[in-house]
């Protein structure tokens, strides 16, 4: 392959990547506002600046696009948990995980709300992911946390309930943002409130799992 051909291929690859990114971003905005059934592909295509035909070239159906968006959300959420290793200092690792989850709630509130909508609907289009890769990851990290408990590095808690509690307390600030703002007058976009939230959620959870 000539140098010119390589450059052309590289440009084409970047263009495809940028177009997919624009479609996924537009899909997240639209699905989180109207839900799966209330969204039309024409809306997403218009927001992404592509034709419907072009959209369907990359994502063959509305369902395929919706699942791609949800998988992208899961990848963002689960990356910090995937990084957990047995040699980590447990309290420091969990404390940092809480911060990262709150950063996700701050930076991707629409993603959190869309995922919540899917769960409330019974996860009809995401159940394979939940019972497959997600469950496998939670089983793996629960065993790791159980090892920390057994070695006395954490208080005697159930690992799955700890993970659920972290998810619930951090995602609340995205899923129920209007309620949080109505009560406190602030959102996670407010730097002072964000730091207060991180410190309080960390303290409440960490003090509950600190070995006595």
From Swiss-Prot:
Gene3D superfamilies: Homeodomain-like, Tetracycline Repressor, domain 2. The keyword Transcription applies. The keyword DNA-binding applies. GO terms for molecular function: DNA-binding transcription factor activity; transcription cis-regulatory region binding. PROSITE patterns: HTH_TETR_2 (PS50977). It comes from the Bacteria. SUPFAM superfamilies: Homeodomain-like (SSF46689), Tetracyclin repressor-like, C-terminal domain (SSF48498). PANTHER family: HTH-TYPE TRANSCRIPTIONAL REGULATOR RUTR. This is HTH-type transcriptional regulator RutR. It comes from Escherichia coli (strain K12).
């Amino acid at each position: 392959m000539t140098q010119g051909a390589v450059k052309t291929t590289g440009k084409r690859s970047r263009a495809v990547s940028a177009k997919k990114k624009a479609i996924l971003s537009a899909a997240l905005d639209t699905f989180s506002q109207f839900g799966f059934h209330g969204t039309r592909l024409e809306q997403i295509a218009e927001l992404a600046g592509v034709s419907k035909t072009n959209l369907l070239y990359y994502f063959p159906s509305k369902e395929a696009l919706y699942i791609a968006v949800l998988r992208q959300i899961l990848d963002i959420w689960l990356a910090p948990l995937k990084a957990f290793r047995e040699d980590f200092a447990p309290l420091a690792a969990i404390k940092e995980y809480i911060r990262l989850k709150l950063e996700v709630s701050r930076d991707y509130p629409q993603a959190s709300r869309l995922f919540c909508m899917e769960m409330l609907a019974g996860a009809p289009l995401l159940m394979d992911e939940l019972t497959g890769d997600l469950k496998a990851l939670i089983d793996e990290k629960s065993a790791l946390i159980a090892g920390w408990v057994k070695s006395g590095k954490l208080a005697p808690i159930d690992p799955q309930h700890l993970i659920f509690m972290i998810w619930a307390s951090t995602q609340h600030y995205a899923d129920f943002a209007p309620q949080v703002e109505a009560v406190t007058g602030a959102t996670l976009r407010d730097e002072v409130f964000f730091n207060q939230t991180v410190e309080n959620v960390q303290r409440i959870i960490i003090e509950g799992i600190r070995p006595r």
